Amino acid sequence: ITVAGVTPTGYNGTFNCTVTTSTNFTYALSGSLAAGTGGVYTPEDVSELVAMATTFFAQGSGLSCYVLELGAGNATDGATALQAYITANPNSNYVAGATGYFYAYLVPRTWDGNATFLAMLASYESTTAKTYFFITTTLATYTSYTNLMKCAFTLIESPSFGVYSANALTAATYSGGFVTATTTTSHGVVPGNWFTIAGCTPAGYNGTFLALAGTTGNTLVYAVSSNPGAETILGTLVANLYANSAIPSTEFSIASAFYRLLQYNPSASNRVAPFAFGYVFGVTPFPTRGNNALLTTLKAANTNIIGTGAEGGISNTIILWGTTEDGHDFTYWYSVDWVQINSDEMISNAIINGSNNPQNPLYYDQNGINRLQAVEQVVMNNAIAFGLALAPVTVTATPFATYVSQNPTDYPAGIYRGLAVSYTPQRGFIQIVFYVNVTSFPAAG
């Protein structure tokens, strides 16, 4: 929640709260304050929706999007409601011009790592699902997503880092989902900073965490998903050498990538560019200084960040690395979906028109198969021209006589399963290795 307008002003700010009754909530503050008067609160979802829209439209004004209201509740309630909505409106039922079907969903931050949401993602891992989720994850939770989740595009927003030295722990205890750790000396971490603990046993105390309210002096408070058990070896607060400010409250970084997806409109003059390294605007780049190992880990986990084009002498912010959780550039699955959707539409169009053309009806015979094969070849030729498929692509068809001999019950039912295509989606470069050989001996001219 965000609290504003309270006197004294120390009550104001944005906080994690605990709802205690239908009319009361609590939140943590450091120090003591006189009784407060006045003020208003704004639920997180209100400011988050505004931030989503602000970042989305910072990319341009040529697109619109829907806001799908799922009702009041927590992340579990929201994921359950969304699953019910998609089940009632599956993208497999979509036909051209239909409404209420959505290709991708930009979900709230609070859904990150939620067990119900993760279970829902498992329902959309098939190659024919054609449904995607843009998810803001964190340094503490990005490992919740697996490389089977081709439906998930995850991104970590630029985190808040402080500057602090390595500091040995003297205690670590767990209670009710939270760890309280004590450092040898004052650590310099403040609530809202991210920090790393290493070297503890059990390992559940280790990781990168968000400092919560109550972090001060030589005390660190952070959340963990389960009880690690009693500590037997105490580790260390890992040093951080470079400070970094968190994103502003008006930013929802992954909304920029969401816009980039929605602006795809494939044609021969508007080819589909790779998702990786795409320009995005109004977003904060992830800090790079001192984070080489972390950035390598995130890339290997197929977790995206906002970067810059500095390596190429370009000041724009860009998407790194543009992949879904299975490691494919988003355009890979966009291509697969485009081929499925357009093949269905164009073949259906040919069959329907063929049933309404007395001069040239479409029959289930060799000529009819040839005509459908030609229709599908046009689809694949367009995929090449639009930047979605690597040339060449050839559509094959089992000859009529062979097919009906091998599948005798299909002809009476009007079923033909003999069309096929194998192709490779088009993609861009990710890394170039360039070899330079330097010598002191000039070559003979």
Where are these regions (language model features)?
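Small/polar beta-strand repeat architecture
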Residues: 4-44, 164-194, 198-241
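Surface-exposed assembly/interface segments
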Residues: 2-5, 15, 42-163, 188, ...
